[in-house]
Design a protein with these regions (language model features):
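Bacterial N-terminal signal peptides that target proteins for export
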Residues: 2-17
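Bacterial N-terminal signal peptides
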Residues: 15-26
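Contiguous, structured surface segment used for ligand recognition
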Residues: 31-160, 411, 434
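Substrate-binding groove of N-acetylhexosamine-processing glycoside hydrolases
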Residues: 37-39, 44-45, 52, 106, ...
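Extracytoplasmic/secreted cell-surface and envelope-processing proteins
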Residues: 66-68, 201-204, 243-246, 302-304, ...
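Short, hydrophobic beta-strand segments that form beta-sheet elements in well-ordered domains
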Residues: 96-98, 162, 338-343
Length: 679
């Protein structure tokens, strides 16, 4: 999957500026008392509230799924009011949850919710519909009661999902994934996709997985069972076309690669195809969704190595279709539909009509383009079902670039609905391994809202509802703080082609000339960058003070703000150290200026200590946040970057300390070039 960082043109920068200004400065929507995500199809607000004093009862039938939904509702009431509702069998209570087979307008996942001052009823045809009605009711509960309202609701898309890269860095703990799934289910997400290159410990291919970095069959089955209880299906994506560089570097598998340096299996190699079919056959047993995703993006190597003759004889398109068809047979025999990334077929549109008719194209596009119609037309015109797959734009960045992600999710999901898409997957990617899921809640939950609501989903409605629905906090301090963190991308794009990428956090003014040159580019907006991140931290802490749930997830927002703040600080330190050393050089030969020279040198030493301390604090916090959601696997690779950064600060401090002592003993100072303080 090409998670490519592209430079943004003037048009994109203008859109980013307008988006940020809108998010930070928009007034509250008049009359929007109900803060709900997703936004229901129909809401009629009334007057008054259903009180939740002592003696609240929740009436529900004997079905285990419905009683589980009732237990979540009881927990919500207890958390909001301190009261402990009773769950009773039957159809009489303060709140009634009931199946209503005649409610055909609700479809398979819709519901009807009616709240009166005397009681509330949630009705649905199915367990899923009742579950989703309860999630809406939970968001309506406040300590002073439930607002009177009538809601009729059903989803726009059958499948509403999140795509989680677990293969190139962070591997979540089972507990963290369960929490994600339970939280996403509150927002009516019903599909969770795990992207694996070698993050599954296959029984049939034990060399695939790295120790400590893979899910066992028992873990995947337990996760699927947990997800099922929350009406979420687990979708396994196992790359079998490419992105298998680590696997194909092993002696046991290197002969299966298209070329000696390729991460792609060779379609001309029977053993390569057998491996792919074996992996997918086992993956099908773990995927509780009706699909298995086979990958298949970025097929750039096929035909360059051992499949050259086959491709020359039949054409790369025919080779691709034959292989996909074989994989489709393997999965169909196990009751699964084949999902595949659509970019190769989009570049060869004549192949669409030759694809297996039950296959599903995952059409990804992470841009903020105005229209996505052409991206879907190739498949829909050939009668192929599609998933639309926008992106959280979190990859290789300190924080998701919301100025790209929100319009992308909004536009692609809206277009998918128009074209009859089967579902939506909001994609998170972990390129370079320095990625934390806790940073992604805002775009991921926006995707949930966009996939459920029919038509366009208003980002302003989402902003005003985010704090309440995710944190149970009044106001919109957290949403505003998130916008301020994300504004770093717009601030930095004003002076450089790229946005706030991870690479910026490793620029060190104590290192070489390239780092100093790049930091000099950031110097102009450094103060603005620091101010906005300080405001973000303050806003996040205000939200934390009133949050009743998920307050710990604000730690990720604050960490991103501190990391971005440090980038601005490093740009400032670079200029100060350069100026101080220049002043020291200019005055070192004046006998009456030795005190001034030492003051300047000591000031630089102090700045170096400041930079090192800041880096150490970020390292410790990063490690804590990583372990709060991930296994220790791979963490050492990121900590090594922090350690190298710390070493740079320390080595420069040591060198300058030697120069300072030497100066005190009569030696001249090294040149600015020699000390690394030159422009």
């Amino acid at each position: 999957m090409p998670r490519i960082l592209r430079a943004h043109g003037k048009r994109a920068r203008l859109a980013a500026i307008l988006w940020t200004a809108t998010l930070l400065g928009a007034p509250a929507i008049a009359g929007a008392d109900l803060r709900l995500v997703p936004e229901p199809a129909s809401v009629q607000e009334g007057a008054g509230r259903l009180p939740l004093g002592g003696g609240v009862t929740i009436a529900v039938g004997n079905d285990d799924e419905d009683r589980f939904a009732a237990s979540l509702l009881a927990d919500e009431i207890r958390d909001a009011t301190g009261q402990s509702p009773r769950i009773v069998n039957g159809a009489s209570g303060s709140i009634v949850l009931r199946r209503e087979p005649s409610l055909t307008s609700a479809g398979d996942e819709g519901y009807r919710l009616e709240v009166k001052a005397s009681g509330a009823t949630v009705a649905a045809r199915t367990a899923a519909g009742l579950f989703y009605g309860v999630q809406t009711l939970r968001q309506m509960i406040e300590p002073r009661g439930i607002p009177v309202a009538t809601i009729e609701d059903r989803p726009a898309l059958r499948w509403r999902g999140v795509h989680d890269d677990i293969s190139r860095g962070p591997v979540p703990t089972l507990e963290a994934l369960e929490r994600r799934i339970a939280t996403l289910a509150e927002f009516k997400v019903n599909l969770y996709a795990l992207y694996s290159e070698q993050a599954i410990a296959y029984r049939t291919a034990p060399l695939v997985a790295n120790p400590g970095g893979a899910f066992t069959p028992a873990e995947l089955r337990a996760l699927a069972a947990f997800a099922r209880r929350h009406h979420v299906a687990l979708l396994i994506e196992q790359q079998v076309f490419g992105h298998l560089d680590r696997l194909l570097s092993l002696e046991s598998y290197k002969a299966l690669a298209e070329t000696p340096t390729s991460g792609a299996l060779a379609p001309a190699n029977a053993n390569a195809r057998a491996l792919a079919e074996s992996l997918l056959a086992e993956a099908a047993t773990y995927s509780s969704a009706p699909f298995v995703h086979v990958g298949g993006d970025e097929m750039t190597d096929v035909g360059k190595g051992q499949s050259r003759d086959l491709v020359a004889a039949r054409g790369v398109g025919a080779v691709y279709v034959d292989w996909l068809t074989d994989l489709d047979r393997t999965l169909a025999a196990r009751g699964k539909r084949t999902m595949f990334w659509g970019d190769f077929v989009e570049s060869h549109p004549e192949l669409a009509a030759k694809l297996p008719k039950d296959a599903v194209a995952a059409v990804w596009d992470y841009s903020g383009r105005e229209s996505f119609e052409a991206r879907l037309a190739t498949f829909r015109g050939a009668g192929i079902d599609v998933f639309v797959c926008p992106g959280a734009t979190n990859w290789s960045r300190v924080f998701p670039n919301l100025a790209t992600a929100i319009p992308n999710i909004r536009g692609l999901t809206r277009e998918g609905q128009k074209k009859g898409a089967l579902g939506e997957l909001t994609c998170t990617w972990d390129d370079n391994g320095d990625a934390l899921f806790g940073l992604c809640w805002y775009p991921v939950l926006f995707g949930a809202g966009a996939a459920w609501k029919s038509g366009d989903y208003d980002p302003e409605h989402f902003r005003l509802a985010f704090d309440w629905t995710f944190l149970r906090a009044p106001g919109h301090d957290a949403a505003d703080a998130i916008a301020q963190v994300a504004s770093a991308h717009t601030i930095l794009q004003a002076v450089r082609p790229m946005d706030a990428t991870i690479e910026l956090s490793w620029l060190n003014p104590a290192r070489g000339s390239l780092d100093r040159q790049l930091l000099a580019m950031i110097g102009a907006p450094a103060l603005e960058l620091r101010r906005t991140q300080e405001q973000a931290i303050e806003g996040a802490e205000r939200a934390r003070a009133s949050a009743r749930r998920n307050a710990d997830q604000l730690d990720y927002v604050v960490f991103a703000a501190r990391r971005l703040h440090a980038i601005g600080q490093r740009a400032i330190l670079a200029e100060r150290m350069k100026a101080y050393y220049k002043d020291a050089l200019e005055n070192q030969r004046a006998p009456d200026k030795s005190g001034r020279v030492l003051d300047r040198l000591n000031a630089i030493l102090g700045l170096l200590v400041q930079g090192r301390e800041q880096s150490a604090l970020l390292r410790d916090e990063y490690q804590r946040l990583w372990l709060a959601e991930n296994r220790p696997y791979w963490l050492g690779n990121v900590l090594a970057e922090f350690d190298r950064d710390l070493q740079v600060w320390s080595e420069k401090w040591d060198r300058l300390r030697v120069a300072t002592v030497s100066f005190k003993n009569g030696a001249p100072l090294p040149s600015a070039e020699d000390m690394g303080f030159a422009p």
